[in-house]
Amino acid sequence: MNIRIASTVLCLSLVVGGCARLPEQLPNNPKDQVDLDIPRPTGIAAAPWPAQEWWRSANDPELNRLVQIAFARNPDLRAAAAKVLLAQADVGAARSRLLPHFDADFALTQQYFSAQGLHLSANGTSNTFGALNPIDIHYHVDLWGQDRDLVRAARGRLAMNQAEAAQARLLVSTAVVVQYFALEGDRRLLQQTEHLHTLQEQAKAVAEGGFQQGLFNASQIHAEDLALAESAQRIAKLQAAIAAEKHALAALCGEGPSMTIGSATITKQALSPALGLPKNLPLRLLARRPDIVAARWAVQAAAAEVGAARAAFYPNINLRLLAGWNSIHLGDLFNPGNFAHAVGPVITLPIFEGGALRAHLRAQNAVFLAAQDRYRSTLLAALRQIADRLSTAQKLARQERAQRHAAAAAQAQWELRQQAWRQGLSDALPSIAAEITCVQVRQRRTAITTARWQNWALLESALGGGYRHTIKDG
């Protein structure tokens, strides 16, 4: 009896005190808070959150078609979807640790025993060993929560990958919209520049006629030649930019450079010139931005991995049940006397691991601290993006107002000079020059309009692009 008590005390002391020693202290990150306040600039009214298919606000069928093609064929989106499938499989693998494992095994071995061997009854003979175990059950007793932590970590990585897949869709749709607006803006600029080139050719013809009549000197012709060369260069640059933008759109859509990109049908009424911010923006932004959601789930997954690493310092307990037959002679394998069974716990004590467990715990804790910092960095970047879009919107609105005044003044000047030319009070050159000024003003307005379209798309993206956080379990 005393021997049993002593054995029990010895086992308990090994279980409690014989495990690998936990680190005395792990580094900790200060729980500093991020200021989520975004100043609302003057003139920015309240507005709803972006719709899930926010780009449809442009009312452009060609743009809608391109975004849908990109969603279906973009290779980056397919890779992100594959990562979600992998994470779902990882969740299933982690969950399997919580359940008993049922196996069956059969072994057949032919062996010859030496004449002077240790098996006296079998020495000098050849025998066939047979072992059949139809029941072999293993169950890990998750006493310290290691398996549960691993499941939580896998679920966290699944949610993170789902959010990252949503972020990839948002980035692709935003890139398509911004690139499409750039293409449409350059197409309009090309038309205007070609018109400008035609007017400059007319101005040169008038200057040459005036030179022959002695009304102008050669410097006027040289000035028109210089203007023609500059507009020709501008046309070449715009043509190259349009080709590059088409190629970029085709790549985003998972197509080759020969993909056909139709013309835009965007109207002034398609996109509201007055941008707005949703109410309760700072708090709701946490669940509206997929990159923020992904970063938050990365923190939770890393925290669960720290818990699993801590549990590795404690005894590992497994239960095993084994039942079957084994015999040194295959012919009598199923005799009742050859039936064997075993049941009991298997306890593994991590007494000395050469510092491996401590190093693994410190590594997981470092991953957790890095995930916290990435979360804060992602949140700060999101706030900065929104603030940048708002300030850009204000700047473009001021430029648009200035260009409207410039367009009105240029139009009035052209009408006066056109009237003077028709009345014979001047030659055609001042009228052509005034029309050239009108075209140049329209070019600047086109550039501003394109920038406003792109800024609208970037703001919709910065607000999450209609994303709402949901978890699809594996």
Question: Where is each model-derived feature located?
Answer:
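A short glycine-centered flexible hinge/capping loop motif at secondary-structure junctions
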Residues: F211-L215, W421-L425, A462-G466
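Sec/SRP-type N-terminal targeting helices
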Residues: R78-A79, R95-S96, V141-R169, S219, ...
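Membrane-embedded beta-strand positions in outer-membrane beta-barrel channels/transporters
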Residues: V67, P134-D136, Y180, P282, ...
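Small/polar, glycine/serine/threonine/aspartate-rich low-complexity segments that form flexible
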Residues: W49-A58, D105-D136, M259-P278, G307, ...
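Transmembrane beta-barrel architecture of outer-membrane proteins
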Residues: L63-R65, L86, G130-L132, V178, ...
